[in-house]
Amino acid sequence: MNKDTIFSAPIEKLGDFTFDESVAEVFPDMIQRSVPGYSNIITAIGMLAQRFVTEGSQVYDLGCSRGAGILSIRRNLQTNQVKIIGVDNSQPMVERCRSHINAYHSDVPVEILCDDIRHIEIKNASMVVLNFTLQFLPRADRLELLTKIYQGLNPNGILVLSEKFTFTNQAMSELLIDLHHTFKRANGYSELEVSQKRTALENVMLTDSIETHKDRLKQAGFSQIELWFQCFNFGSMIAVK
């Protein structure tokens, strides 16, 4: 696993964070050291797939990055009569995802598309995964995507939505942000790395509160919604049709 050193030296003109070649190369290390509970979420996505994915249906991982979620799903399926579709708009991520998926033999077909997730038709879905993806979409586009997902899910289909959250209580918000930064420092990131990455993400990662997510999921049509995992200001929700 290549180590993430992208923000380790001072960057004079710090642009917005993008999932480019340099990020794709170190992404597994970056996300493990940056997102508390990430490996637990990936494991649980497989458990949920075991329970919810049905024969003859399709599974979508929207914003699939290098394919960790897809592999977890595929390992846990009860049937190989399923198609998994992974979508990411980063060509470097897609290339590595395809290579990663192909390194493991399986009879379950997987298609990896380089596209904008807003352009993807969702149909005959028993499971859809948005793992730290929605927060990178413009807020104005989020409800439309979730509505499209709801409509494309089969009855008893599941959406897994993992996000970084904001909190309305200022003191609690500051505490959870500070704990997250402590987590990153404990994983070897310097103050400079934490600061520069935070600045790079400011304009591209627009986070919402748990309440906002729940309200939006209800507007999209979901009625069974639950926060099943949280660590500091990161978490994952499930919504069942």
UniProtKB/Swiss-Prot annotation:
Keywords: S-adenosyl-L-methionine, Transferase. S-adenosyl-L-methionine binds at residues 38, 63-65, 88-89, 116-117, 131, 198. Its EC number is 2.1.3.-. It catalyses: prephenate + S-adenosyl-L-methionine = carboxy-S-adenosyl-L-methionine + 3-phenylpyruvate + H2O. Pfam families: Methyltransf_25. It comes from the Bacteria. Coiled coil: none annotated. It is an enzyme of class 2 (transferase). GO terms for molecular function: carboxyl- or carbamoyltransferase activity; S-adenosyl-L-methionine binding. The keyword Cell division does not apply. The keyword DNA damage does not apply. GO terms for biological process: tRNA wobble uridine modification. Belongs to the class I-like SAM-binding methyltransferase superfamily. Cx-SAM synthase family. Catalyzes the conversion of S-adenosyl-L-methionine (SAM) to carboxy-S-adenosyl-L-methionine (Cx-SAM). Homodimer. HAMAP family: Cx_SAM_synthase. This is Carboxy-S-adenosyl-L-methionine synthase.
